[in-house]
Curated annotation (Swiss-Prot):
The modification Phosphothreonine is found at residues 8, 108, 134. It comes from Dasypus novemcinctus (Nine-banded armadillo). The gene is HBA. The keyword Zinc does not apply. Pfam families: Globin. This is Hemoglobin subunit alpha.
Amino acid sequence: VLSAADKTHVKAFWGKVGGHAAEFGAEALERMFASFPPTKTYFSHMDLSHGSAQVKAHGKKVADALTLAVGHLDDLPGALSTLSDLHAHKLRVDPVNFKFLSHCLLVTLACHLPDDFTPAVHASMDKFMAGVSTVLVSKYR
């Protein structure tokens, strides 16, 4: 559960991500594919090369979902219900992959916004990403 301070940190930090969200989402995906090669199996239909238009497009989808989640911190299950259904029932993504992508996104954000990615913001963003991951795997049960 995100505290009031966590919510403040997440909203303020995501605001600083701003127009770079899609770019950072794509970079996090590329980082995940490089660091955790088995994740590529879910994207076998895509060109996974660096800078690929398909990876950029999916990075934008990731960023848009996170922007939606940031706007609904008090109701992540409601905001992400459709995505949860998609990943659980249609795509059948192994739940561990959400942790991998979360980690890679946090690394990407820390690399690009080091002055803003304070220990407190890191902790809050980690809790936020864990919450998003929990919601996305909730329909697997």
